[in-house]
Amino acid sequence: MKLIPEYPYLYETHFHTAESSRCGRSSAADMVDACKAAGYTGIFVTDHHWGGNTRTDRNLPWEEWVDGFCQGYYAAKKRGDEIGLDVFFGWEAGFEGTEFLIYGLTPEWMKAHPELRTDLPFGDFAALEDPLTVEKQYALIHEAGGMVIHAHPYREEPYIPQIRLFPEYVDGVEAVNATHSNPLSKSHNEPVFNERAWAYAKEYDLPVTAGSDIHSTDLFCGGMAFKHRLKGPEDYIKAVLNREPYLLTDGAKWYDQQGNLIS
């Protein structure tokens, strides 16, 4: 991936591992090695959470479930520390196919909040008495200082019964999902999904993000590039919410925050 010289720090913001996501095809360590070789400065591990395609048994007690869920992150962090790739924690929350990327919190915080469990559309766990909703999620994550990004809001797939938008309950929009537009993508490959996401963000004046949504070592090299190195998720949140200088890429093309083609 050829970087723009003024924006030398590239981050993957949408990343699934075989340890924690059923759809993951490569181990966290192998994916970290691939990202380092591709020129990334860091990654956010965002495995599928309770209401999505998680690999961890939902019948486990909550704290044990969180430990299992975090195995992909822990493995990625261990390998990242060994080879010099920054690895940050996040997750992808699912609500009957509508998904959100969560940043800025920790596994320890997650263990203390069993109310993160959502109702499940697939019938593999008993219904909850008080499941998390999109509205409750926004309040809970914000209270803790985290950030909520609507992932691929216009993707059309059988696992997504309907397109649902929640502009008042998100901090931003994933306007560039590399699986939609990168020529190497073999799934969800429909650029109009990104075009609609850009329009949605502009209509509601929401910040935009970019990520590859990768599940294996077959990288697209999508993500976001910054002028400075991010010290942690807090720097990422600050940059997005304050619309600090950064570029977005699907691994094939570069865009500014208004959606203009840079390169």
Tell me what each language-model feature is.
Residues M1-P8, D30, V45, L132-G145, ...:
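C-terminal functional module detector
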Residues K2-E135, A139, A175-E203, H215-D218:
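A metal-dependent hydrolase metal-coordination microenvironment
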Residues D57-P61, Y103-G104, I163-P167, G222-K227:
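Short low-complexity, flexible loop/linker segments enriched in glycine and/or proline
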Residues G90-E92, H142-P158:
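Aromatic-lined carbohydrate-recognition surfaces of secreted/lumenal glycan-active proteins
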Residues T98-G104, W109, R155-P167:
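Distinct, well-ordered alpha-helical segments
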Residues P107-M110, E143-M147, P167-V173, L206-P207:
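Glycine-enriched alpha-helix->loop->beta-strand junction motifs that scaffold or abut catalytic
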Residues V148-H152, E174-A175, G211:
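Short, conserved beta-strand edge motifs with alternating hydrophobic and charged residues
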Residues G172-A175, L230:
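Short hydrophobic/aromatic-enriched beta-strand-loop microsegments
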